[in-house]
Amino acid sequence: EIASCLVGSEMCIRDRLCVKACKKIGYYGVGTFEFLYEDGQFYFIEMNTRVQVEHPVTELITGIDIVKEQISVAAGEKLNYRQEDIIFRGHAIECRINAENPYNFRPSPGIIKSYNVPGGPGVRVDTHLYQGYRIPSQYDSLIAKLCATGHNRETAIAQMRVALSEFMIEGIEHNVPLHCDLLTQSDFVKGQQSIHYLENWLAMRQKK
């Protein structure tokens, strides 16, 4: 999701460092810096020099077509934006919809027998699925990206809950139920999740 619910003014400092780093190494194109955040400090992990799976949420709150910009850069054209042109508006959340058991992540190949995606203002679905599509046994589990936006995190979560309830995929197992469960957990709603949140939540669920 974007913007992060875990940081405040530190994000602005970090972003300036990312821009400075790109200028220093002469990087020109789309890229993503990844950090871990703990106790008021952020720690650099890596830079991915490509368009990320999560790019739709950035597009939704900036209004910038990141894929289009990357294609333009690859063609030798200049970027259409400067750093001061980038303004965040609202909040966006992305749920990766995978063809797998929602709680043990066992792959679920098969034929899509029935399929309906949510829509409307504030909802975006990126997918290649259609009714009758066969998911082979050798595959990437990602079958769709469901995004929801709102003027703040609370409304984005509410929008996502509705969108997930309207997402229908029959013929295979998928992780929509997992997303529905997670978006109702108080820790998630309060923004208190961590990199260990999912594994801890699943462990607690199995004990019940």
Regions found by a protein language model. Name each.
Residues E1-I13:
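Single conserved hydrophobic/aromatic residue that forms the stacking wall/gate
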Residues S9, T32, H55-T58:
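Glycine-rich phosphate-binding loop of ATP-grasp-fold ATP-dependent ligases
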Residues D15-K23, I71:
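Short amphipathic alpha-helical segments
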Residues K23-Y28, E38-D39, H151, E170, ...:
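Secondary-structure transition/capping motifs at alpha-helix termini
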Residues G26-Q52:
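Conserved metal-phosphate-binding beta-hairpin within the catalytic cores
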Residues P56-K208:
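Catalytic cores of soluble metabolic enzymes centered on carboxylation/carboxyl-transfer
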